[in-house]
Amino acid sequence: MHETIRVKIITPSSIAFEKQSKMVTMPGEDGMFGVLPHHVPMIVNLKAGLVQIYIYNIHNYENTYLISGGVTEITSHYINIVTEVAINVTNLSESEISTQRYELQKLLSHQH
């Protein structure tokens, strides 16, 4: 299967990520879920957590972003993830990701 879906992660200050991908998993309010090309159109609220982007195959994710929550618009050909904060944690260790997650939670708790 050579089909892909365009994935864009959008923050108020920039487009944090934009690329064709095989699959994306993200943190919905009811738990993690995955999206493949030709997915049924939907809009989903997202909670803070990890977005994993599978560029080359659906068995290994190549890009990981920590997001602050938000909303995603899904169509059969694209995924737009709109979030206040998106941190590229692709090359970080599990402990570094935990630290980033903690710092993000502190930031979000001070905003509300």
From Swiss-Prot:
On the tree of life, the source organism's domain of life is: Bacteria
- Name the UniProt key words of this record, in alphabetical order: ATP synthesis, Cell inner membrane, Cell membrane, CF(1), Hydrogen ion transport, Ion transport, Membrane, Transport
GO cellular component labels: plasma membrane; proton-transporting ATP synthase complex
- Keyword check for Ion transport, yes or no: yes
Give the protein's biological function: Produces ATP from ADP in the presence of a proton gradient across the membrane.
Protein family: Belongs to the ATPase epsilon chain family.
Q: What is this protein called?
A: ATP synthase epsilon chain
Q: What is the lineage of its organism?
A: Bacteria, Pseudomonadati, Pseudomonadota, Alphaproteobacteria, Rickettsiales
Q: Which gene encodes it?
A: atpC
